[in-house]
Amino acid sequence: DTPLSITAVDASLLESRNQTDLAQIAAQAPNVTLNAMGGAYGSSLGAAIRGIGQFDFNPAYEPGVGMYIDDVYYATLTGGIFDLLDLERVEVLRGPQGTLTGRNSIGGAIKLYSKKPSSEGGGSVDAVYGSRKRTDVRASANFTLAEGLYGRVSGVLKRQDGYVSQMD
């Protein structure tokens, strides 16, 4: 039990809403703005919780919203448009989180938790093909390495041609 404002989204809810990247989570978390930002340093995440955050893609600035992947702090939101692949849950904690998560979370924190390997073997593959040769493949597999030792692998491939063909 956590005595704070939190929005938790589990894997089944992510799948049923067809949410595939982090910017789509803001639609179900009040007072949260997550925007995909283009920039010179790669695709960035503009994040603000309760009006506190950063919409500058410069990696020299530290964000006011903390990003954590499996409880490991992600120091910049540059490149922060993550595909929501093979996740157990996503948590959005609103308000200052310095006591719970540490530094750079004065506005709040976004926490991603990966699925853990288990004794149940299996996997999944999702594929999309669309206009301009768009190809999206998302796959994950769970397997046994040795008795009592399990592994999990997941990956994403995204490709799409542009609108214009270069004629040399």
PLM feature spans:
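Outer-membrane beta-barrel translocator/receptor signature
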Residues: G64, T76, L85-R94, T99-Q166
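Short aromatic/basic micro-patch
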Residues: A8, Y68, L84
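Short beta-strands and strand-coil junctions in structured, solvent-facing domains, enriched
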Residues: E15-S16, T33-N35, F55-F57, Y74-T76, ...
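Extracytoplasmic beta-strand/coil segments of soluble accessory domains associated
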Residues: P3, A23, A27-V72
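ATP/adenylate-binding site constellation spanning eukaryotic-like Ser/Thr protein kinases
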Residues: A11, Q19, N31, E62, ...
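N-terminal periplasmic "start-of-domain" segments of outer-membrane beta-barrel proteins
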Residues: D1-R17, L45-A48, V65, S118
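A general structural signal for stabilizing positions within well-ordered secondary structure
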Residues: S16, A23-A26, I81, L100, ...
